Structure formats: structure tokens, C-alpha cells
């Protein structure tokens, strides 16, 4: 971090830096200030009934969410649900997120020996578990970098109403080093939003400071599989497990434990609420709003849809390509925060009928 304490917000220019400033403290601020604006215009009264729920478990799969919804179903029932946990296409271009990938997360354990061995005395006829794990994980991608797991939903062309994403812009936004090639095939936005991706997010291996001439007997890795809209999470996990079982190196003993399985989100249907959202965003920014997808996941949206099937779900947010959510130097653009607050106030007013169409 470029500041002493990531949990103390620091303003630099038009951006506010700090852990969680954008993902997702900004969402809480958006709801609070939009309601404050509406209340101030009507002597403390809101033009419509609003329930605010701050969900603090999203990053760990929302294990308590379904039970909470069931317990408080009557209090939380809504015609429209606004989830302020996404992003805009770029600073100055407001966006409504109409597509989110789902997520499947598993722990993969590979055992090769019943105890550690001297790598000089025994290396050669036996692979250590870490090396075998690397071979197993590498089998999950083909030579082009596409996920090679059979049975996964994959769309090589993104939705027609999504904006074009020039490769040069993506490389700059992502901080890709010169000379590093992009992985995968198909439209760039499809690779980000409508095709699966697989990431090694953790691995138990011997740290360098403890390295020795040892054949490691076992190794555990954590894999995160992002799944395309239309993919059943359970079927995706089954496909991943089947692939791993098929490609175990040299007959190692494989154990796969599921950790998380969250469905994707498809909000492409045009509804009165989505039309109102486009109007509110476009008005607040004085620029036409666009539909975008997101490669990330918000699994609890599916839980909301199952619990309240008649509700229209709108996904908005404050992030932009410079936000760096989940990374050091996370930040949000303060001008964008002001505009999303105004947009949400306008949206609620339009939905309540306080502002005509």
C-alpha cells in the first residue's frame, strides 16, 4: 500500500484510497445518502417503502443469508431489489450490470507418499506431491489458455449490447506486463464475462525459508472456477471433479472437497425497473448508461431471486477500472460516488411515482 494504514481512508486527488472503500463500503454509503436526499425533500418521509439490508458475508459465500431471508421474508419482500456491489464501464460512463459469472470453489488434495523422503535418495522414480499437483492443475487449461474442463457452459461471443473492450485498454486497466500474451480465445468481453475461468487461489507448499531436499508427501490446492451464465453450479463442480480424477498424475490419491457453489446471474431482460435505472443513471451522469457484464460473482442474488421470484433485481455500483478491488491501493472516484447517490435517489423517486416517466 502507498499509505501507512489501509484501513484509514486517504484522499489523493479525486480518489479515496483504503481497504474496502469501493468494495463494498461505497455501496452502504450509496444507499444511506440516497435515502437521506429523498427524506430531506419530503419532511423526513420517503416516497416509497424501503428496506436496507447490509450483507457482510458475501466474500465468504453468504452462509447465513438464506436462513436470514427465510426468517425475515415478510419484512424483506420487495418489488425491486437494488444491489450496489458492481462497477461502471469507466469513470464518466454509468452502467447497469446485467450479467455475472457464478463461482465454484474446491480444495484439491493429492497424496503421493505416506511420509516425506530424501529427494536425493528417492527422487526420480517418485514425484513429490507439489510437482504432481502442478501437473494436475496445468491440465485444466489448453494450450490457448481456455479452460479445458469438459461439460462447462461457454459462450465465445458476449451479449450484443455490451460495449467493445479494446485490448489496449484492457491491458492498461489490468496492468499486464509488456510482452505477456492474453490467454483464451473469443471476444475479450466473453472471456471476462460469459466464458469460464479457473484460478489457483491458494496452495500448501513448503515456503522458501523452510525448503530442504525433501520429497513432499502431500499437497493441497484451492481452485476457484468462475462459471458462465446458464451453468448449474453443481454440474460445474461435478465436471471439474471428473476432470481432476481423469488427469491425476501417476496414480496419486486424489481428494476433492467442495467449499462454495454460487450460480451466475442473467439480468438481461428489459423491465420497467431496468428502464427506470437506465434513466436515473443517464440523468445523474448526463451520459447514456450502458449494460455491462462482470466476471465476478454475487451468489446471494440467486438466493434473492428464489425467495422473491417476482422481484426485479438491479445491480449497480461505484467501481471502475482503477478501483483495484481485493488488491493493495483500492480506491473509488469521489465524483462517481456523488453521481451514483443521485442516481439511486432518482431511481427510487421514479419507481415510487414521485417523478413521472
Provide a role label for each language-model segment.
Residues 226-228, 255-270:
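A short beta-alpha structural unit
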Residues 41, 94-98, 208-213:
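Short beta-strand/turn micro-motifs at beta-sheet edges
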Residues 16, 109, 133, 203, ...:
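Zn-dependent metallopeptidase/amidohydrolase metal-coordination segment
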Residues 22, 114, 225-232, 262:
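A generic structural motif
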Residues 1-51, 339:
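Active-site metal-coordination/substrate-binding segment of hydrolases
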Residues 89, 98, 119-203, 231-253:
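Acidic-enriched catalytic cores of C-N bond-cleaving enzymes acting on peptides and small amides
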Residues 47-128:
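Histidine/acidic-residue-rich, glycine-tolerant segments that coordinate divalent metal ions
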Residues 125-126, 210-217:
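Short, solvent-exposed beta-strand/turn "edge" segments of beta-rich domains on protein surfaces
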Amino acid at each position: 500500500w502507498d499509505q501507512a494504514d489501509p484501513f484509514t481512508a486517504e484522499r489523493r486527488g479525486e480518489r479515496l484510497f483504503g481497504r474496502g472503500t469501493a468494495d463494498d463500503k461505497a455501496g452502504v454509503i450509496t444507499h444511506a445518502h440516497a435515502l437521506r436526499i429523498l427524506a430531506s425533500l419530503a419532511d423526513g418521509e420517503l416516497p416509497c417503502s424501503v428496506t436496507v439490508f447490509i450483507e457482510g458475508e458475501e466474500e465468504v459465500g453468504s452462509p447465513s443469508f438464506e436462513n436470514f431471508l427465510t426468517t425475515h421474508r415478510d419484512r424483506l419482500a420487495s418489488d425491486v431489489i437494488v444491489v450496489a456491489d458492481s462497477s461502471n464501464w469507466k469513470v464518466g460512463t454509468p452502467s447497469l450490470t446485467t450479467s455475472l459469472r457464478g463461482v465454484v470453489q474446491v480444495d484439491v488434495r493429492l497424496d503421493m507418499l505416506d511420509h516425506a523422503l530424501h529427494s536425493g535418495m528417492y527422487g526420480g522414480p517418485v514425484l513429490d506431491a507439489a510437482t504432481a499437483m502442478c501437473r494436475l492443475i496445468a491440465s485444466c487449461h489448453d494450450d490457448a489458455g481456455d479452460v479445458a474442463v469438459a461439460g462447462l457452459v461457454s459462450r465465445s461471443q458476449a451479449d450484443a449490447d455490451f460495449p467493445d473492450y479494446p485490448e489496449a485498454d484492457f491491458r492498461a486497466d489490468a496492468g499486464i506486463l509488456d510482452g505477456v500474451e492474453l490467454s483464451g480465445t473469443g471476444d475479450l468481453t466473453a472471456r471476462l464475462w460469459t466464458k469460464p475461468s479457473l484460478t489457483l487461489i491458494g496452495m500448501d507448499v513448503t515456503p522458501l525459508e523452510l525448503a530442504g531436499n525433501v520429497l513432499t508427501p502431500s499437497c493441497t490446492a484451492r481452485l476457484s472456477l468462475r462459471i458462465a451464465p446458464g451453468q448449474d453450479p453443481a454440474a460445474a463442480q461435478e465436471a471439474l471433479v471428473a476432470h481432476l480424477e481423469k488427469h491425476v498424475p501417476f496414480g496419486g490419491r486424489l481428494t476433492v472437497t467442495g467449499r462454495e457453489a454460487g450460480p451466475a446471474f442473467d439480468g438481461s431482460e428489459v423491465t420497467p425497473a431496468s428502464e427506470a435505472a437506465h434513466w436515473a443513471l443517464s440523468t445523474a451522469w448526463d451520459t447514456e448508461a450502458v449494460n455491462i457484464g462482470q466476471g465476478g460473482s454475487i451468489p446471494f442474488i440467486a438466493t434473492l431471486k428464489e425467495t422473491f421470484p417476482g422481484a426485479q433485481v438491479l445491480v449497480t455500483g461505484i467501481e471502475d477500472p482503477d478501483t483495484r478491488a481485493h488488491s493493495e491501493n483500492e480506491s473509488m472516484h469521489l465524483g462517481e460516488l456523488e453521481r451514483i447517490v443521485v442516481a439511486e435517489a432518482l431511481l427510487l423517486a421514479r419507481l415510487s411515482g414521485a417523478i413521472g416517466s
